[in-house]
Curated annotation (Swiss-Prot):
Complex and partners: Homotetramer. Forms an RuvA(8)-RuvB(12)-Holliday junction (HJ) complex. HJ DNA is sandwiched between 2 RuvA tetramers; dsDNA enters through RuvA and exits via RuvB. An RuvB hexamer assembles on each DNA strand where it exits the tetramer. Each RuvB hexamer is contacted by two RuvA subunits (via domain III) on 2 adjacent RuvB subunits; this complex drives branch migration. In the full resolvosome a probable DNA-RuvA(4)-RuvB(12)-RuvC(2) complex forms which resolves the HJ.
One Pfam family cited in the UniProt record for this chain: RuvA_N
Domain description: Has three domains with a flexible linker between the domains II and III and assumes an 'L' shape. Domain III is highly mobile and contacts RuvB.
NCBIfam families: ruvA
Protein's recorded name: Holliday junction branch migration complex subunit RuvA
Region of interest (Domain I), ranges: 1-64
Segments of this protein annotated with the region Flexible linker: 136-139
Chain spans, region Domain II: 65-136
Matches recorded under HAMAP family: DNA_HJ_migration_RuvA (MF_00031)
The gene coding this protein: ruvA
Protein localization: Cytoplasm
SUPFAM superfamilies in the cross-refs: DNA helicase RuvA subunit, C-terminal domain, Nucleic acid-binding proteins, RuvA domain 2-like
Length: 191
């Protein structure tokens, strides 16, 4: 329903951010990983989101990357894992590391998340081990083009926006820095 939020970061708190989108302020629950990716209040931020509708509330969950959102949705599909537990897991480590832990059946690592015991961690491994999508090159730890990120930041984009654009496949394929900048600007341009 609400697939993304792009606006001015109003406040960062433990587990949530407030984002002003043209006069409407959204409270978006996030993982610690996403909180670290976001800038400071006043910066323009962009989050991919998932809206959960309950009888008594609407809860918006936001993530810095599509990979983090996909892993969040996969974790929600596991019996006994709710949104809070999924966020706690995503706060432990980056999505690629969590995926490695699940595939490697590292139950002790998963059980370190608040609210996730060994029994739930075992269930996560059992249900997701073979279902998680393959990691992309960037998720697997390929370095981000820091020169491109710095150039985009010099043009006024936030660190988060610059990193997201730098990881786009079209941008990564461009041979020279100038061509990567042009490709990144195409990705960052409003639709």
């Amino acid at each position: 329903m609400i697939r993304g939020v792009r606006g001015t970061l109003v406040a960062k708190r433990s587990g949530e951010v407030l984002v002003d989108v043209q006069g409407v302020t959204f409270r978006v629950q996030t993982s610690a990983t996403t909180l670290q990716e976001l800038g400071e209040p006043g910066d323009l931020v962009s989050l991919v989101t998932h809206l959960i509708v309950r009888e008594d509330e609407l809860a918006l969950y936001g993530f810095a990357t599509e990979a983090e959102l996909e892993l969040f949705l996969s974790l929600l599909a596991v019996s006994g894992v709710g949104p809070r537990g999924a966020l706690n897991l995503l706060s432990l480590a980056a999505p690629d590391r969590l995926t490695e832990w699940i595939r490697g059946e590292r139950i002790e690592e998963l059980a370190r998340a608040p609210g996730i015991g060994k029994k739930t961690a075992s269930r996560i491994v059992l249900e997701l081990r073979g279902r998680l999508p393959a990691l992309t090159e960037v998720q697997a730890g390929e370095p981000i083009d820091q020169e491109l990120v710095a150039a985009l930041q010099a043009l006024g984009y936030t660190a988060q926006e610059a990193r997201q654009a730098a990881t786009h496949p079209e941008v990564r394929r461009a041979p020279s820095l100038e061509e990567r900048i042009v490709a990144a600007l195409r990705q960052l341009a409003p639709p």
